[in-house]
Amino acid sequence: MKILLVDDERTEREGIRFLIEKFQFELEVAEAANGKLAMEYLQKYQDVDILLTDVKMPYMDGLQLAKYAKENRPDVIIIIFSSYSEFDYAKKACEVSAVNYLLKPIEVEEFKQVMEHVIALCRQKKQWKEQKENLLVADKKLL
């Protein structure tokens, strides 16, 4: 599984990477310093399972990025993290189908729980996709 971390602050990306390693999540980590670079990454690589993005960034904010991801890569699971605690931002995150909204500074235990949930969701989606493909193959054999 692959996660794309998007934040214009390198220390934030390093902190998230540290937590991923600390909890031994089996994730390949890719990074982007802003939404525009992340969008280009998503266009180039089809193997991103999780998009973890900040909201406020130069060139393209995280909500615009999440909207792009949902429209063009509907299987990607989106998590928004931000220092904005206003309800309006959380509402906008829901509108782009984010599965969670984490506040900065990241609470370590909350991050762990969210990531465990999202990784389980990724595994479940992959199983469903494999089952669907197997059923299609079996269906073709019957015809």
Model-predicted regions and their roles:
Residues 7, 51-54:
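Active-site residues of response regulator receiver
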Residues 10-30:
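Two-component/phosphorelay signaling modules centered on CheY-like receiver
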Residues 31-40, 62:
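Helix N-cap/capping motif at the beta->alpha junctions
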Residues 40-41, 63-74:
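Short amphipathic alpha-helix used as the core "switch/output" element in two-component signaling
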Residues 57:
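Receiver (REC) domain active-site loop signature in two-component systems and cognate sites
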Residues 94, 106-143:
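Interdomain helical linkers/hinges and coiled-coil/dimerization scaffolds
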